[in-house]
């Protein structure tokens, strides 16, 4: 059975100094979401992959909701052309709002902020607080070290084997979009396995 997907939260870098292959993947993902009329939810940044995925979704006829703390707006770090801009008070509120608005998460490569967002949403799913698909878009094998670390966590019993199904890995934007439709929704009762 296909999941009903109206919105997708995309985590990604704000850096402008990264390889063009990452920008290509971000634009392709934004285009696919826009063409399918899937609302893009992100952190409303006006630089890097965050801006690239937003601009591509908008060009393809999609809608973008950006969620950003007020202090970042005051710094002028927000994208001014989004369909909707939601200002919040803190980084914590930003992440919760993005999760609450989304039917799935796709993580593109990024730095500490992206990695922190991804690991937090994985943790929420482990605890049964987020039940929707989480897809890691492994452009240029960027996430291989993280995936190795997660496998090691399972191997050494810091996580259960069942927790390996919390996330799925895609190599292309097309595969990532297909996975958000086909990945089974998580069962909240899994939280009984949260502790080893």
Predicted regions and their residues:
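A cross-family phosphate/adenosyl-ligand binding-site feature
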Residues: 2-101, 140-179, 184-196
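Active-site/ligand-binding-proximal alpha/beta "capping" segment
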Residues: 93-128, 135, 186-192
């Amino acid at each position: 059975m296909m999941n009903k997907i109206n919105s997708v939260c995309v985590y990604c870098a704000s850096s402008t100094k990264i390889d063009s292959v990452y920008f290509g993947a971000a634009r392709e993902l934004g285009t696919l979401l826009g063409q399918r009329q899937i609302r893009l939810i992100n952190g409303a940044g006006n630089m890097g992959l965050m801006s690239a995925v937003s601009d591509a979704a908008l060009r393809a006829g999609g809608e973008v909701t950006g969620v950003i703390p007020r202090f970042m707006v005051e710094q002028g770090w927000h994208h001014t052309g989004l369909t909707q801009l939601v200002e919040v008070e803190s980084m914590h509120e930003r992440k919760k709002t993005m999760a609450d608005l989304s039917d799935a998460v796709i993580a593109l490569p990024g730095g500490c902020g992206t990695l922190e967002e991804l690991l937090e949403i994985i943790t929420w799913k482990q605890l049964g607080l987020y039940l929707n698909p989480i897809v890691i878009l492994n452009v240029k094998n960027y996430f291989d070290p993280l995936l190795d670390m997660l496998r090691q966590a399972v191997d050494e019993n810091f996580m259960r084997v069942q927790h390996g199904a919390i996330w799925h890995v895609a190599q292309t934007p097309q595969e990532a979009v297909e996975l958000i439709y086909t990945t089974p929704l998580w069962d909240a009762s899994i939280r009984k396995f949260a502790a080893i």
